[in-house]
């Protein structure tokens, strides 16, 4: 299977660089996997697409202001993008500098925080901050929201709220689980009032989610690793939903990857799992847990467009993307959404 089979041409003006004023006013393209039928809706119409006893599984990670600018103690400019918080004082980070950091090198970030490079792990640098402050407090104080590279503008104060789900509560992501950006408190309440069940997994989205696939064939690609938590209350909620004839609806590819990973490590049967995952889902994958999903529109030739193609059918997805372009849908993190049922 060729990576080029997942390519499409996107006009630049369809890349959403700012969020819509109202979270639920985004457009929603509904694609039925078995039939390939497409319908055009708005996100608030989700209430009509879900049923009582369906289970929505959200990713409750919270985006940290992970990007910092500063200089090396020796004077050169440096940019730090935190990939993972290791503990109260240490992080793994991508570092851009004129000369690569060496163990013992110090950096001064935003003129306020001092960190020392203590080790290198492949392309990531382990940085240790001074112990007078918790690293999350430092990031909240001086960090910038890590907007994706295709949102080619500086972050602003509004991004601190809008590049964040309303239900995110566990800091650790360096990219938003973007399908969740369309939910507001009013919609969450309306869904609960309808009898829709809710459960929460955690996947701390890493910067690797934006890394391009650099191989020609899909099965050559090596997936990045991310930390997930699928607690036992989620396992119980899924079992109860299936027993009552409801659907498990994943909110975003991160929720899909979390649920399917927790099933994969247990031989295809969902069970509790806390740990790393590098699951790579592409056409041919047999889903064990998820029946439907909500997702944004993804980059061409990305692992995420491969995942949704595995879920709803590659021809269906590529056709729906062409339709979305014709209909002027907004693409990527701040863009519109899709509701997919499994083929």
UniProtKB/Swiss-Prot annotation:
Known SUPFAM superfamilies for this protein?
QueA-like (SSF111337)
KW Transferase (keyword) present: yes
Alphabetically, which GO biological process terms does the record hold?
queuosine biosynthetic process; tRNA wobble guanine modification
Which principal EC class is assigned to this enzyme?
Answer: transferase
Which EC number(s) does UniProt give?
Answer: 2.4.99.17
The cross-references to Gene3D superfamilies, in alphabetical order and at most eight, read:
QueA-like (3.40.1780.10)
GO CC annotations on file? cytoplasm
Task performed by this protein: Transfers and isomerizes the ribose moiety from AdoMet to the 7-aminomethyl group of 7-deazaguanine (preQ1-tRNA) to give epoxyqueuosine (oQ-tRNA).
Q: List the NCBIfam families.
A: PRK00147.1, queA
Return the similarity comment.
Answer: Belongs to the QueA family.
Check the record and name the HAMAP family matching this protein. Answer: QueA (MF_00113)
**Can you say what this protein is called?**
S-adenosylmethionine:tRNA ribosyltransferase-isomerase
The organism named in the record is Pseudoalteromonas translucida (strain TAC 125)
> Gene for this protein?
queA
């Amino acid at each position: 299977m060729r990576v080029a089979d997942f390519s499409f041409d996107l006009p630049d003006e369809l890349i959403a660089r700012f969020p819509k004023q109202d979270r639920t006013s985004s457009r929603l393209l509904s694609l039925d996997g078995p039939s390939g039928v497409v319908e055009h809706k708005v996100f608030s119409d989700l209430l009509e697409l879900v049923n009582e006893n369906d289970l929505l599984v959200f990713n409750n990670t919270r985006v940290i202001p992970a990007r910092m600018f500063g200089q090396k103690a020796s004077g050169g400019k440096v940019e730090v993008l935190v990939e993972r918080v290791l503990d109260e004082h240490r992080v793994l980070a991508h570092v851009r500098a004129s000369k690569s950091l060496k163990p013992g090198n110090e950096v001064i970030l935003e003129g306020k925080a001092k960190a020392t490079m203590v080790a290198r792990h492949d392309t990531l640098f382990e940085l240790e901050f001074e112990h007078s402050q918790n690293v999350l407090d430092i990031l909240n104080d001086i960090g910038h929201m890590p907007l994706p590279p295709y949102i080619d503008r500086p972050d602003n104060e509004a991004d601190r709220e809008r590049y964040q789900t309303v239900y995110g509560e566990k800091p650790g992501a360096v990219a938003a689980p973007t399908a969740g950006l369309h939910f507001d408190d009013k919609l969450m309440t309306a869904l609960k009032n309808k009898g829709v069940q809710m459960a929460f997994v955690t996947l701390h989205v890493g910067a690797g989610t934006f890394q391009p696939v650099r191989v020609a064939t899909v099965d050559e690609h090596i997936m990045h690793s991310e930390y997930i938590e699928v607690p036992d209350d989620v396992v119980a909620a899924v079992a109860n939903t299936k027993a009552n004839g409801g659907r498990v609806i994943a909110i975003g590819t991160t929720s899909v990857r979390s649920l399917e990973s927790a099933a994969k490590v247990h031989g295809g049967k969902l069970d509790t799992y806390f740990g790393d995952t590098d699951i790579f889902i592409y056409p041919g994958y047999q889903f064990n847990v998820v029946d439907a999903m909500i997702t944004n529109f993804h980059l061409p030739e990305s692992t995420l467009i491969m995942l949704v193609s595995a879920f709803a059918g590659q021809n269906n997805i590529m056709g729906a993307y062409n339709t979305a372009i014709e209909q002027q849908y907004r693409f990527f993190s701040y863009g519109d959404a899709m509701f997919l049922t499994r083929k």
